[in-house]
């Protein structure tokens, strides 16, 4: 792997650490923010000479940075530009009303600037998607700005206004001014959001070192709206102007630190203290990724370590981001990690006592939503304690929380404090990599190997593969960002603790080499706006620390036997399965290493499927289920092919429903299909009775709750099915038929996602599932009549109940399980968005087109199936599509002609399926949530298509070994341009 000169890297790292030490600790590395600068520019002070602007350079900065279209810079998110422009428009109006400085622009210029700013803000608000905004506190800050602008004569109406007002009401519903007066809360960081709501004089005592939570905008608001002047606040703002990132040019950061704040994370939002720019983070990043204290300068690291250790001891084992500020788990965890790496460990008991919750660690008291990144840091801190075994329960709790969040995440983990999806992945990979090390060394015997194998390792492997697959052509990641590229390289490095990485080692080396080459060959001094404060900000210091870490981190691999033995993944088997799947049109253009990576992921998930393999259907008397092994591959391949990255929870549930469908098909053919006509009729009545017993959805929910009591799970965390009702159908029907069918139906209908679905969605699953089972009996009846024909007449079906079109569009396609599985899949997708009355498609048009699209998909799959299974069907006397009278004109000895016609019809159905997807895309009208939903629907179509392509190669039913026997099979010539 390409690596920079080690000596040069150590020199750069040492210089970076030296920047953390100044004579008085007053140094800030956070980029200047127009929003805070605008607030400071509005502060007036009464002097003997009259009223004056306190810091006129700040208003000069606002004037200098207004863009041609009237707005101010949007750093990374739409809300950045909105807040910057709104605050600056307010500053323009304030200066226009108070002509107290000769340096302010002429009246006409001010009017022109105000007009352009107003128009720009109106455009920004109209184009803004409120529901897609992640910045914490915007729902309080922006309404306050709009309220102040309304007082200046500016009224703004926009599509997202109702949603913004709704969020504002929710946020303020429990707010009481007394909270700010009596306790030091994070809301003090944004006092400007409470103009007109609080008495500013009553928060004066909350000031620390001349500021309110180290926020220039909050401190400016206090000076503007309190009844008396505060010299300490003035001194603080002047200090920020001179020493902050603006360097005296007028720009003010969103937060400015002091004292050991410089070696702790800069935090502060309306909702919580959260770490952003942090010299502590820079220090721990370097120490944890290949740099020693000697590399960084013993004197510097010792003094920083002592400072942090003293703070922890004085705080009872916990710290906040600055003296006298509320302690939080994130800063505490980072501090514990740092002192441990500096060989000055402090007990983690204070962290546990203060922040441990029932299911995860709280970042601070009163936190509403748990933080993924905070729990990652907590886990890493606990793992770095001298005796990790003593905190094993807490380690498992934090790790389980991270796994649960990753398991249910849609595509990627979002973080409130960093816009890059690679940042949470990096922290999780670092924590899980350390967990594997400590567990392998025998330090965590209470944590089961199953948890390590089935949860931790799957999450870590997915983080690795998804990082590898999203690398840009020039070797970078994200928006061609140095900092994001460093995150990605560090993710890969820590994921190398997994033994299965050996399967991809060449690709890992190549990706890291390309990434490091990008970091070395391109300038990295440009600000990269990734960190979230009131607006997004950048930090050259943090960026450099991550880049230096990525250039030096080790990729050495050593796998103790206890860890390596958890993963039985044959490299030969992976290569053979990858070769086979690469033959299929859907994956023929997919890079071979990506195919292998998906196969390995499938193998990692396979043990969980085996645990549930006998949940419904017994294998007694059945042939070997060779299909079982490759079911996870079809899903992981399609999931990774387009980087869809469906949630792992949904992915696994669809794998389970896939093998249950095969088992149901086997049961209906091997057991029900061999019954006589009278018994099949009784089975039909049995199925009808099972579904009648389900009743309507509301009653069903009550009945299930009464029957099963609390939501039960077995030792593996899987649902325990309620005891299936035994249907009394007489002695002629084998007893296991009603029991097994009832268990299968209840497994599907009792699924939490189905139970939580909207009534229409629930009924659709119910109806499609019933049709699926009944279609097997209809198919068996058709097969029976077909088999009764003389062998000499068996090329054509003489007793067809309908046209070929009607049959293949109903009985035959229902028999594939595609329609009912799609209905079930929609419930899973809907449940990802809402826990009650969830629906994947909302409007009548969407539902209709989606169902029509699925029907074409099912028909296409059935035709592919019959295309490949003609010889088998003939041997087993089963009805095939080409036996319908419509194909008779081809003649009796015309298999090739009939198959060609059938394939042509399958391609017709494919075109209709594609058109359905196109119409759904048009209906989505660029709605982000709907477009994301359609990506998942496309993936379902891909999975179904894969099965059809496998069927067409006559593999699934012939019983050959997919990993070995299929490589001599040839693709249909017609397939060259079909996918």
Swiss-Prot record:
Amino-acid positions noted as binding Mg(2+) 3 in the UniProt annotation, renumbered to this chain: 865-866, 869, 873
Disruption phenotype: Abolishes the production of ent-pimara-8(14),15-diene (PD).
Residues annotated to bind Mg(2+) 2: 665, 669
Short sequence motif VYDTAW motif: positions: 34-39
Catalytic activity: (2E,6E,10E)-geranylgeranyl diphosphate = ent-copalyl diphosphate; ent-copalyl diphosphate = ent-pimara-8(14),15-diene + diphosphate
A molecular-function term among this protein's GO annotations: magnesium ion binding
Pathway: Secondary metabolite biosynthesis; terpenoid biosynthesis
Cited SUPFAM superfamilies: Terpenoid cyclases/Protein prenyltransferases
Residues annotated as signal peptide: none
Binding site for Mg(2+) 1: 665, 669
Superkingdom as given in the UniProt entry: Eukaryota
Cofactors named for this entry: Mg(2+)
Extent of motif DEXXE A-type cyclization motif: 665-669
Keyword terms: Isomerase, Lyase, Magnesium, Metal-binding
Family listed: Belongs to the terpene synthase family.
Name of the protein in its database record: Pimaradiene synthase pbcA
Source organism of the structure: Emericella nidulans (strain FGSC A4 / ATCC 38163 / CBS 112.46 / NRRL 194 / M139)
Gene name as annotated: pbcA
């Amino acid at each position: 792997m390409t690596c920079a000169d080690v000596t040069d890297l150590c020199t750069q790292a040492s210089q970076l650490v030296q920047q953390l030490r100044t004579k008085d600790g007053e140094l800030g590395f956070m980029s200047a923010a127009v929003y805070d600068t605008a607030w400071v520019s509005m502060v007036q002070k009464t002097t003997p000479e009259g009223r004056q602007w306190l810091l006129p350079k700040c208003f000069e900065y606002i004037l200098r940075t207004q863009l041609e279209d009237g707005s101010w810079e949007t750093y990374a998110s739409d809300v950045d530009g909105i807040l910057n422009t709104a605050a600056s428009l307010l500053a323009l109006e304030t200066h226009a009303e108070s002509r107290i400085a000769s340096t302010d622009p002429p009246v006409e210029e001010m009017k022109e600037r105000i007009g352009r700013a107003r128009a720009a803000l109106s455009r920004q608000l109209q184009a803004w998607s409120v529901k897609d905004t992640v910045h914490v506190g915007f729902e309080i800050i922006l309404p306050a700005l709009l309220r102040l602008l309304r007082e200046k004569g500016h009224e703004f109406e926009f599509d997202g206004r109702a949603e913004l007002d709704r969020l504002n009401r929710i946020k303020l519903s429990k707010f009481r001014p007394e909270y700010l007066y009596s306790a030091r809360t994070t809301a003090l960081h944004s006092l400007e959001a409470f103009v007109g709501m609080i008495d500013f004089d009553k928060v004066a005592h909350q000031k620390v070192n001349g500021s309110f939570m180290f926020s220039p905008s909050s401190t400016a608001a206090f000076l503007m709206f309190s009844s008396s002047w505060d010299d300490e606040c003035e001194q603080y703002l002047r200090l920020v102007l001179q020493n902050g990132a603006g360097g005296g040019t007028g720009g003010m950061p969103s937060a400015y630190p002091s004292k050991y704040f410089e070696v702790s994370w800069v935090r502060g939002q309306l909702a919580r203290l959260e770490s952003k720019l942090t010299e502590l983070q820079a220090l721990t990043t370097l120490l944890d990724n290949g740099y020693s204290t000697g590399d960084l300068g013993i004197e510097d690291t010792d003094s920083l370590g002592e400072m942090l250790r003293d703070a922890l001891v004085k705080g009872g084992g916990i710290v906040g981001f600055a003296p006298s500020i509320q302690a939080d788990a994130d800063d505490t965890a980072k501090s514990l990690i740092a002192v441990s790496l500096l060989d000055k460990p402090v007990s983690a008991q204070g962290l546990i006592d203060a922040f441990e919750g029932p299911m995860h660690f709280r970042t601070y008291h009163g936190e509403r939503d748990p933080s993924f990144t905070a729990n990652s840091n907590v886990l890493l801190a606990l793992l770095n304690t001298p005796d990790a075994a003593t905190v094993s329960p807490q380690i498992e709790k934090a790790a389980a929380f991270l796994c649960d969040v990753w398991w249910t995440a849609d595509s990627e983990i979002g973080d409130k404090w960093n816009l890059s999806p690679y940042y949470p992945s990096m922290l999780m990979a670092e924590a899980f990599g350390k967990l594997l090390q400590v567990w392998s060394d025998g330090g965590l015997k209470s944590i089961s190997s199953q948890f390590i194998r089935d949860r931790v390792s799957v999450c870590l492997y997915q983080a690795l593969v998804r990082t590898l697959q999203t690398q840009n052509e020039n070797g970078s990641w994200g928006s061609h960002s140095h900092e994001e590229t460093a995150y990605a390289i560090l993710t890969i490095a820590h994921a190398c603790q997994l033994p299965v990485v050996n399967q991809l080692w060449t690709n890992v080396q190549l990706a890291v080499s390309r990434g490091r080459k990008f970091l070395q060959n391109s300038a990295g001094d440009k600000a990269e706006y990734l960190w979230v404060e009131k607006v997004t900000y950048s930090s050259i210091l943090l960026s450099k620390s991550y880049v230096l870490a990525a250039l030096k981190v080790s990729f050495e691999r050593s796998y103790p036997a206890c860890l390596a033995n958890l993963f039985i993944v044959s490299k030969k088997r992976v290569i053979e399965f990858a070769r086979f799947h690469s033959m299929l049109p859907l994956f023929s253009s997919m890079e071979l290493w990506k195919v292998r990576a998906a196969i390995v992921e499938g193998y990692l998930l396979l043990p969980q499927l085996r645990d549930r393999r006998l949940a419904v259907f017994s294998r007694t008397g059945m042939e070997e289920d060779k299909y079982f092994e490759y079911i996870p591959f079809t899903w992981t391949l399609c999931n990774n092919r387009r980087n869809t990255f469906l949630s792992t929870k949904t992915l696994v549930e669809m794998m389970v429903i896939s093998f249950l469908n095969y088992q149901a098909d086997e049961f209906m053919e091997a057991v029900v299909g061999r019954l006589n006509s009278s018994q099949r009729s009784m089975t039909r009545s049995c199925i009808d009775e099972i579904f009648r017993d389900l009743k309507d959805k509301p009653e069903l929910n009550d009945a299930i709750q009464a029957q099963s009591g609390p939501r039960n799970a077995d030792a593996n965390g899987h649902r325990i099915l309620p005891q299936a009702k035994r249907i009394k159908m007489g002695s002629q029907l084998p007893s296991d038929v009603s029991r097994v069918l009832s268990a299968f139906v209840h497994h599907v209908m009792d699924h939490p996602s189905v139970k939580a679905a909207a009534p229409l969605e629930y009924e659709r699953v119910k109806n499609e599932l019933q049709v699926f089972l009944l279609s097997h009996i209809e198919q068996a009846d058709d097969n029976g009549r077909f088999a009764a024909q003389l062998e000499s007449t068996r090329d054509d079906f003489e007793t067809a109940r309908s046209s070929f079109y009607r049959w293949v569009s109903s009985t035959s396609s229902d028999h594939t399980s595609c329609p009912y599985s799609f209905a079930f899949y929609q419930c899973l997708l809907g449940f990802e968005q809402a826990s009650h009355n969830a629906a994947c498609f909302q409007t009548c048009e969407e539902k209709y087109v989606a169902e029509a699209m699925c029907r074409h998909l099912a028909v296409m799959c059935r035709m592919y199936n019959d295309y490949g299974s003609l010889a088998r069907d003939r041997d087993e006397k089963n009805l095939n599509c080409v036996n319908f009278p419509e194909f008779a004109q081809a003649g009796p000895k015309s298999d090739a002609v009939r198959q060609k016609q059938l394939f042509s019809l399958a391609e017709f159905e494919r075109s209709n399926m594609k058109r359905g997807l196109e119409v759904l895309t048009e209906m989505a009208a660029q709605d982000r949530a709907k477009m994301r939903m359609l990506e998942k629907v496309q993936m379902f179509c891909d999975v179904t298509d894969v099965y059809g392509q496998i069927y067409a190669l006559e593999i699934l039913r012939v019983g050959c070994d997919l990993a070995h026997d299929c490589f001599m099979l040839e693709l249909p010539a017609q397939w060259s341009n079909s996918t």
